[in-house]
Amino acid sequence: MSGMVRGIRGATYIEKNEADCIIRETKLLLLEIVEKNQIKAEDICSILFTSTSGLNASFPAMAARELGWKYVPMLCSVEIDVPDSLQNCVRVLMHVNTFLKQDQIKHVYLKEAKKLRDDL
């Protein structure tokens, strides 16, 4: 596929700092992003993950690896600890090759993370 490289944002809330919770919720987020935007793994250029400082039981990128996305470059980082911001949150920036226009991209915010972008 060619087209353009576009960024797709997403975030979800993780109830407990446990590896299975982080991986399960991140996997659900990734699956919803690819479904809503009709993306195949080979269309994904890269994924950046951030998590708030209280989530360190697993790398969120493990969720993508469990989905079989072994050729997608990924990076995990800690989100800036802004006072009064949403905690226990994994954020995603997925770069994809797509023919969708910017206003056709469907960003995905789940659970308590919906309040991060209530304009969408």
Question: Where are the predicted features?
Answer:
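Terminal domain-initiation and capping elements
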Residues: M1-L120
